From Swiss-Prot:
Its main location: nucleus. Binds estrogens with an affinity similar to that of ER-alpha, and activates expression of reporter genes containing estrogen response elements (ERE) in an estrogen-dependent manner. The lineage of its organism: Eukaryota, Metazoa, Chordata, Craniata, Vertebrata. This is Estrogen receptor beta. Composed of three domains: a modulating N-terminal domain, a DNA-binding domain and a C-terminal ligand-binding domain. Belongs to the nuclear hormone receptor family. NR3 subfamily. PANTHER family: KNIRPS-RELATED PROTEIN-RELATED (PTHR48092).
Length: 568
């Protein structure tokens, strides 16, 4: 006599129990259809897992399963239990899987309705059975017009390990990680994205006891699991990633709080754009809502520096050979030609500095008119920093001190340029620091702005200072990446900022020299360069008489305005 296996007993028991259940009138049971493609000798193999483990014998007759999904009004097409495409196995060999995972629920592998399988559940025109429990591993079926993502959600939930929020899509897009330990960041604290633990640790360290000593070699790994193992290395990494006591706390608070704040800012900015007689001329930028809420571009220092570096203008070539010996007219013609070309690119560069184009057109013009020679001189120093004793005006024009002495009155300016360049060389100026200093010169050149205390003027100035603070934070962050101690970073920041005053002094010297050359008719000036020079002289004369700066554009500003308006 054939002895029935335990699996057969269980199958028969389940089959008889289900077929003996009472069905309300008009209902029909679901049937598991025979599988021909995977049957081997009365056994069924998994379409996914092709292993050497013994297959399970299954009775040949259909097994009836009571359906809780009756009379839903949907035409449920065939739903295969397993789908290689859904699991992401691709075209990998089926033999790679060594065993069948019996714990997996079949509902995890339901694909969209467009796929057809020989193993299917057929639903007839029936109605929902009242008060019938929907137990087991069966999940709620959805209408056939839903997208494929609806059926992938259970699998995604098992794989993804992210926090659930009310606005999950926006929350995942805004997800940041702690720059110190790589845990989930709770906000932007002390100048970087950081978690609550590292924020609190840094706060305690800068407010009190911080003379930590590393028991090893000051190279301990600081991550989510080992951040508490060494306080000295943790504090060192806080400084390395850019955490600072004086850092502007952008995006402060949780993600939900920042979302509410951004909505308030959007409403405020909308009112600014649509109100006032000058709404067409002045574009709104984020500005302070109150004394404690500082609003800015919401860019991290690293992102801001990346944007400014991408805005750097291309190299300018003179495109002609200068015959030696150099003459005063020859040198001045070449230098003014290069300066005029650089001015066009400088205006394009300024408009790519984050937040600059959001200032009023009046402020943009005045800032450029006040700083243009400082920006050109800083660029000259940066190109010359690796060439001691020479000034690299362009890749095809470099002058030594002796070659520049042919221009009357130029030796003093030449020596000052070489001295400032030598100082940058001693400091080993980095490119990130250079672009920050360049942007600071642009935004800090407000000597020609009106000194009136009107509400509109104060608002414009606050917008400008907000941008300047952001660039200053970026410079502090760039210095922190050099690996210096806190005291050394503070000293380096002071040295770099002090050089800006020397560059302004150099700019005034150069402007006076260029004006003298113009008055002596030693060299013709090009349109844009001439407009910039006249504007600087006009602003200097107005400041000497303590007169207010008019808000209307004059004829001197026409060239600058035309270049700015072309790209606005």
């Amino acid at each position: 006599m054939h002895q029935q296996s335990p699996v057969d007993d269980v199958t028969a028991l389940n089959s008889s129990a289900l077929t003996m259940s009472e069905y309300p009138e008009g209902e029909s049971p679901l049937q598991l259809q025979d599988v021909d493609s995977s049957r081997v000798g009365g056994h069924i193999l998994s379409p996914i897992f092709n292993s050497s483990s013994p297959s399970l014998p299954v009775e040949s007759h259909p097994v009836c399963i009571q359906s809780p999904y009756t009379d839903l009004g949907h035409d449920f097409t065939t739903l295969p239990f397993y789908s290689p495409a859904l699991l992401g196995y691709g075209t990998s060999p089926l033999s790679e899987c060594s065993s069948v995972r019996q714990s997996l629920s079949p509902t995890l592998f339901w694909p969209p309705h467009s796929q057809v399988s020989s193993l299917a559940l057929h639903q007839q025109h029936t109605r929902l059975q009242q008060n019938h429990p929907t137990g087991g591993t069966w999940t709620e079926l959805t209408p056939h017009d839903h997208s494929e993502e609806e059926y992938r959600k259970p699998l995604v939930k098992r794989v993804a390990d992210a926090e659930e929020t009310s606005t999950s899509l926006r929350g995942k897009a805004d997800m940041h990680y702690c720059a110190v330990c790589s845990d989930y960041a709770s906000g932007y604290h002390y100048g970087v994205w950081s978690c609550e633990g590292c924020k609190a640790f840094f706060k305690r360290s800068i407010q009190g006891h911080n003379d930590y000593i590393c028991p090893a070699t000051n190279q301990c790994t600081i991550d989510k699991n080992r951040r508490k193992s060494c306080q000295a290395c943790r504090l060192r990494k806080c400084y390395e990633v850019g955490m600072m006591k004086c850092g502007l706390r952008r995006d402060r608070g949780s993600y939900q709080q920042r979302g509410a704040q951004q909505k308030r800012l959007a409403r405020f900015s909308g009112r600014m754009r649509t109100s006032g007689p000058r709404s067409q001329e002045m574009k709104s930028v984020p500005c302070p809502l109150s004394g404690n809420e500082v609003v800015n571009m919401a860019l991290t220092p690293e992102e801001l520096i990346a944007r400014i570096m991408d805005a750097e203008p291309p190299e300018i070539y003179l495109m002609k050979d200068m015959k030696k010996p150099f003459t005063e007219a020859n040198v001045m013609m070449s230098l003014t030609n290069l300066a005029d070309k650089e001015l066009v690119h400088m205006i394009s560069w300024a408009k790519k500095v984050p937040g600059f184009v959001e200032l009023s057109l009046f402020d943009q013009v005045h800032l450029l008119e006040c700083c243009w020679l400082e920006v050109l001189m800083l660029g000259l120093m940066w190109r010359s920093v690796n060439h001691p004793g020479k000034l690299i005006f362009s890749p095809d024009l470099s002058l030594s001190r002796d070659e520049g002495s042919c221009v009357q009155g130029f030796v003093e300016i030449f020596d000052m340029l070489l001295a400032a360049t030598s100082r940058f060389r001693e400091l080993k100026l980095q490119r990130e620091e250079y672009v920050c200093l360049k942007a600071m010169i642009l935004l800090n050149s407000n000597m020609c702005l009106s000194s009136s205390e009107g509400g509109e003027e104060l608002q414009r100035r606050s917008k400008l200072l907000c941008l300047l603070d952001s660039v200053t934070d970026a410079l502090v962050w760039a210095i922190s990446k050099t690996g210096l101690s806190f005291q050394q970073r503070s000293t380096r920041l002071a040295h770099l900022l002090m050089l800006l005053s020397h560059i302004r002094h150099l700019s005034n010297k150069g402007m006076d020299h260029l004006h003298c050359m113009k008055m002596k008719k030693m060299v013709p000036l090009y349109d844009l360069l001439l407009e910039m020079l006249d504007a600087h002289i006009m602003h200097g004369s107005r400041l000497s008489h303590s007169g207010p700066a008019p808000k209307e554009s004059t004829g001197v500003q026409e060239a600058t305005l035309s270049v700015l308006k072309n790209d606005l």
